[in-house]
Amino acid sequence: MENNEIRFKDIRAYRVGWLLTICDFLIAFPILWAWEKRTTKGVKLDYLGDRKQIEADIKHGAFFMTNHRDIVMDSAWLSKLLRCRYFIRPFIGIGNNLFAYKWIEVLVRFNRCFVVKRGAGAHAQLENAKQLSAYIRHLREQGKSIWLAQREGRAKDSNDLTQTSVLHMLTLDGDDFFENVKMLNICPVSITYEFDPCDYLKAAEMQLKRDNPRWRKTKKDDVHSMHTGIRGEKGHVVYRLTPSINHELDAMLAQHPEYREVPLHDQMDQVCAIIDRHIHRGYEMYERGTDFDAYIESRLALIDIPNKDEAFLREKLYEMYNNPVINYKKAYE
């Protein structure tokens, strides 16, 4: 039997009373462990800086904000790692654009997830954002932990930058922006895959959008990306926890109290820069041997699109693996 196969009689062997949610089930049952063994060389939880400080920061709940590499596995493995080490089971934010089929929506709602509604008109979008902001504040006031990516959708080029729109959405419920941010207790997390199984799909999407700015992914495309991300080879995978940004915010505001009076967009830029610096410093740096060029060519060969521009696609594939290195170096300058 393949590692990732599940037999019904094995499922029945579990006492249902132990399984509070599907998230508990996925962690208790060895499906995530099987995916890890089959598609990686290990999934590791690590720390940037003082581990005791980080553990103190997350003790009473935290807002885990990460870069975004994979639609499914980013949050799935983080949940497993936090659950196994700290008995933390974060609520997970997921965009409704991924509900390609009804079964996905049902699974998501059972899996301690909340929905980030996208694609509505301007007025509806604002109302949805206000409701979500109030819900997140409620969760944090209850001491619950939360996961959300730093941006809407994956960074196709791996240039991981926090979107101010995400930060704005999170802080609509409340009056003082900086105090709203501190209430969230944002603990950035860096996710680094040695190899991105969706790299060739992302490169193809970039050319398709270049050739036709109105091009959009279909539901079938999203499901294919989810499937590829789950089953594709990833090499070594590292999740690196970093300290709460509240420490830097307190120091910054003590030194520059005038920042409380600057326009909101400038305040958001300041906070985004802190989050980005944490994530960039937390990257795992992998050595790329002489066979990396051959790897890129093998990924290029998988791309099957009209008017395939190999030079452009090759450049984008290299860019995906170069940008984290560039940002890592800049973060330490």
Positions of predicted regions on the chain:
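Membrane-anchoring hydrophobic helices of lipid-metabolizing enzymes
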Residues: 1-62, 68-79, 83, 105, ...
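A short, conserved acidic/glycine-rich loop-to-beta-strand motif
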Residues: 63, 90-94, 184-190
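Glycine-/small-residue-rich active-site loops that bind phosphorylated ligands and cofactors
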Residues: 69-71, 99-100, 121-124, 154-155
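Short helix/loop capping segments that flank catalytic or ligand/cofactor-binding pockets
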Residues: 73-75, 101-104, 157-158, 197
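A short alpha->loop->secondary-structure connector
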Residues: 82-90
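Conserved nucleotide-cofactor-binding alpha/beta core module
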Residues: 91-119, 126
